[in-house]
């Protein structure tokens, strides 16, 4: 049976027009737990009502059980944007955003010691006094045990009052308490947005950053996320859209997934297609191996999660589909062999 298959796992409908920002974790018994932002009230904007819904798969993602609610909407507007993290200790963490207003967006975390059967009450990771964007599938645990939650703080999400500032929130007690990094990262125009991080072999942390400057920018931390270098161009063109970076456990190479596109005449710097994967064997200095995941000119693809399950790579991302009434956002699941990324 092939490892390469895909399906729209959470199709959008008129009543549920947006299913986005998901993540997957492999449970100890081999089942897959998928969760995502479920916009349930017939509206699509980022501030529309949403809950965190979930499904389980017993067969590696080929089929999925009934949808259930993992996190009710406790926000003034919604809850959204899922990150799962399996700790070195074995416990499972579930992160999400609580959106209360255009000036109040916080990252929360719940813990499970029984592999997702029960969850603790939410703990706030950010400070409760700002608008913090944390993308799906973003939180990492370093080799030291420290947790790093990359976030961008927005003074005004409508573009006034300065651009976004990227930073990290850090925990040395498995998420029980959190503190902000000592330095932040600033860039022109809309700023340093939607950061993601990966630990490098030399112990530094690489942060990749969404920008309005035509390419992905990067910053480094040599002290476990406490301070960060000034951001610099990464040499990878990109529209105003997020990118995802991680390390393939079986090969040690870095994996980058993003929209390989840039059009300065377009309002968003270009459409969110194609969706491309690239490999780096030199810790992000170059990205010579590239393969196209999606390439439909009338669609968009973004907000990718990456989960490794043995020799398989499990992806989720949203698919933007235009309709006569406007558009919808479906959640897609895709399974690929690790070898696919190497052209095998």
Model-found features: residue ranges?
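Asp-box/BNR beta-propeller blade signature and adjacent active/binding-site loops
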Residues: 1-344
